[in-house]
Amino acid sequence: MIVADLKSLEEIAASVAEYRKILVLGCGSCVTVCLSGGERETQQLTRELIRSGLFGGKLPVFESGTVIRQCEKDLVETYQQVPPDTEAILSLACGCGVQTVADTFEPLPVIPALNTTFYGASNEAGVWREVCQGCGDCVLSHTGSICPVARCAKSLFNGPCGGSQNGRCEIFTDNPCAWAMIYYRLKKQNKLHLLHEVHAPRDWQPAGGAGPRVRIRTGIGGSPQK
């Protein structure tokens, strides 16, 4: 099972402040079990955003809904309740769910409300492709909902390496270059300016660099105790 924690209300509000109509979309699977992103938490976060006072008098229109599993594209495709004129989706799913929803409703921006943290075991026969490593500090709002940690063979944060050719990965040539995917996704969204932003050096402690991690449920939607 994938475990995720709610981002701070301030970070969430800042990430969606430019949009006028937002769908807050929960997930009925892992994050429901860990009390971070189910129907109850989705409704609670929507209420908290509306009354937060963090939008400077320009409060967006918020609507909410829940998909059984955001990480399964066929289930996301059956979701027919995206309101007209929706400008962005605020996803309460893990990084896999955020990226699946973004692929399904492209080029609609999909913003993560959670930080995916770590994974539990699930014994199920099937095939999965890794798109999230649970780094604990989700950057998908800056990369077009495509994870450079998991989908770049070198986990680069500053663009493609010199070996990327024709949109393919230097290490695994059958795979697309993650940063080429990020570039074209942001281009479709008219958000190439995000590639010019300067970010602080990466802190890998939330990814487990400080030893085994413990999650304690407290506060709204299971946000971690500070």
Regions found by a protein language model. Give the residues of each.
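Short, well-ordered alpha-helical microsegments
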Residues: 97-100
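Iron-sulfur (Fe-S) cluster-binding modules
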Residues: 1-66, 77-89, 103-142, 146-226
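Membrane-embedded and interfacial regions of multi-pass energy-transducing membrane proteins
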Residues: 69-70
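N-terminal glycine-rich "phosphate-gripper" loop used for MgATP/nucleotide binding
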Residues: 91-95
